[in-house]
Regions:
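ATP-dependent adenylate-handling active sites, centered on carboxylate activation for C-N bond formation
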Residues: 1-126, 147-198, 210-213
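Core structural elements
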Residues: 133-147
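Alpha-helical membrane-targeting segments
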Residues: 201-217
Length: 217
């Protein structure tokens, strides 16, 4: 189900949005409410049967290697390249905040947390491990999985099969070459192609409107 811009705008003026923010706030990220309004509307129209379990795809692209940047695939990585990869992915949405002072503070924090020495290069496996660990601790755990609060406030059950221990442990041990650009995952689903869903079903991916540049700065 897709919500319209007018529906979303109206939703922002309702007490329910404040209720959701208070319910989902874990003092670690802004609330993730992207599923809340569509599911709420579906509930109001009796489209979700009792006892339903919500299963989303979080976070299959991340654990299967889809977030590994090409810049980290060289045999030896400098600290600056690793820092640039992390900053480019996680600290570049608000351009006005990317000041030299802020970037230096981020670099210092990363160097301390991961015991990185500027004068020494890092081998590829360690650099990617640091990159993925940072995303796991700072984005996946704090923001992405916070989206499950959407279902809880609406009284819906949920499961996250891609975060089951067996699945996570499997991808943890897959060689970097097979994870980069999701090579193993893509080859597997292309060969398996269960009921044609990986080749025959076309999806539409929406994009933010051009005004995002004005909003984000």
């Amino acid at each position: 189900y897709f919500t319209t811009p007018n529906q979303m705008k109206s939703f922002f003026a309702t007490p329910q949005l404040n209720d959701y923010w208070a319910f989902s706030d874990g003092l670690c990220s802004v609330p993730n409410f992207q599923d809340f309004l569509p599911l709420k509307i579906l509930q109001e129209h009796d489209k979700i049967p009792g006892g339903t379990f919500i299963i989303n795809g979080q976070t299959g692209d991340y654990i299967s290697g889809g977030h590994i940047p090409e810049a980290l695939m060289a045999p030896s990585i400098s600290a600056d390249i690793l820092f640039s990869a992390i900053i480019g992915k996680h600290f570049s949405l608000w351009k006005s905040l990317k000041t030299p002072k802020t970037l230096n503070e981020i670099r210092a924090e990363l160097a301390t947390r991961f015991k990185i020495t500027f004068s020494k290069n890092i081998d590829r496996e360690e650099a990617i491990a640091i990159y993925e660990r940072f995303e796991y601790e700072e984005r996946q755990a704090k923001y992405v999985i916070n989206g499950q609060r959407n279902y809880e406030l609406l009284g819906l059950n949920w499961v996250l099969p891609f975060w089951e221990s067996d699945v996570v442990n499997f991808w943890r041990d897959v060689p970097i070459e097979a994870k980069f650009q999701q090579k193993l995952y893509r080859n597997t689903v292309d060969h398996w192609n269960y009921r044609g869903i990986f080749r025959d079903i076309k999806t539409t991916v929406g994009h933010w409107p051009g005004i995002r540049k004005l909003i984000l700065g």
